[in-house]
A protein has these predicted regions:
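Catalytic-center loop of serine/cysteine hydrolases
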Residues: 1-117, 121
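Short coil/turn linking the two alpha-helices of tandem helical-hairpin repeats
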Residues: 103-115, 140, 144-152, 189-190, ...
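Amphipathic alpha-helices of TPR/Sel1-like and other helical repeat/solenoid scaffolds
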Residues: 114-131, 156-172, 194-202
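Alpha-helical protein-protein interaction modules
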Residues: 118, 165, 182, 196-216, ...
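Short, charge-rich amphipathic alpha-helical segments embedded
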Residues: 122-153
């Protein structure tokens, strides 16, 4: 039987194949991924490394990490393909795995529409499988985001986020997502000890997950821990170009810290890393810093339209995001 027939017999949706070629100086690994459902090749890559006896195992590990990040990570080609299929179904009809795919799609590019769809899908999943920890962790993330933007109707969002995040870890102690989200909720709650404990646990569970590494880097930067955060963020973005837009918010903060306002502005323009009124707020702050006052005022008006009490609560609201 050919590999596709074997994959079909085993119930596999995707099959990874490859070849290894070498000469006295180099080794080349060519690999490709096929969707068994239609027989189409959906990803291919070639890796060339010097052929050094002392680095054979290191080379194997480097290639394996690259392949896993490209196809099997939270934002790898498999997750993106399945997520695209799940988007064709109404949120209330998604199964638990599809609900989590919808959650990860929302994390790449959050919007009001996507967060509503996530709430619907994940709440249904929690009703069906209340013992499945990652669903509670994903719901905790949404409540963290509602707290960060001070969304109306979510006055107890931080308490709910902490409760759901702890429930997720209790039900699935080895879940990297669970540990990561408990770190997020702990960060928002100013619990530094819990934040550092959970973020390091998340990284230890799988140090090769681009999403976890990048999120950890982002949180460290938000806490002012740039020496720890920036290398993690750089590593995550280099490993997977399909990373969430909000990762770039870490670079915005770093550029602002260094008073490199033009670079901060480019990050915001190119990646729109903020949700809700925080995007025009970022534009207003940066443009004001470079003397483009009229443009800054225009964005500030957008902030006031979306969040009328922003002026009187700016310090409190900034604390929820920075």
């Amino acid at each position: 039987s050919n590999p596709s027939q074997l994959a079909t017999a085993a119930g596999a949706r995707f099959i990874l194949q490859g070849t290894i070629l070498k000469d006295p100086e180099t080794v080349k690994v060519s690999t490709h991924l096929t969707d068994v459902a239609n027989g189409r090749q959906i990803w291919a890559e070639a890796y060339t490394h010097p052929l050094e006896a002392g680095r054979l195992f290191a080379t194997q590990e480097e290639i394996a990490r690259s392949v896993v990040a490209a196809i099997g990570s939270e934002y790898g080609i498999i997750a993106r393909r399945l997520s695209a299929e799940a988007r064709k179904k109404p949120p209330a009809e998604l199964d638990t795995y599809e609900a989590l795919l919808r959650y990860y799609a929302h994390q790449i590019s959050p919007s009001v529409e996507s967060i509503q769809q996530c709430f619907t899908a994940l709440e249904r999943a929690a009703e069906r499988e209340p013992e499945y920890g990652p669903v509670w962790s994903a719901l905790a993330t949404l409540h963290c985001q509602m707290y960060a933007v001070d969304a109306p109707g979510f006055e107890e969002s931080l308490d709910t986020a902490l409760r759901f995040a702890r429930r997720g870890v209790l039900r699935e102690p080895g879940s990297q997502l669970g540990r990561l989200i408990l770190a997020y909720a702990s960060y928002l709650a100013d619990d530094s000890e819990s934040f550092h404990e959970e973020i390091e646990t998340a990284l230890t569970l799988n140090p090769n997950s681009p999403y976890t590494v990048g999120t950890a880097g982002y949180f460290h930067i938000m806490r002012g821990e740039f020496d720890r955060g920036l290398p993690l963020l750089d590593r995550a973005i280099a490993a997977n170009p399909c990373h969430p837009n909000w990762f770039h918010g870490g670079y915005v903060i770093n550029y602002l810290r260094q008073q490199e306002y033009d670079l901060a502005l480019l990050e915001v323009q190119n990646h729109s890393p903020y949700l809700s009124y925080w995007l025009p707020a970022a534009f207003a702050a940066i443009l004001g810093s470079v003397g483009r006052i009229d443009e800054a005022k225009t964005y500030l008006e957008q902030v006031k339209e979306q969040k009328p009490d922003f002026g009187s609560r700016a310090h409190e609201l900034f604390r929820r995001t920075l």
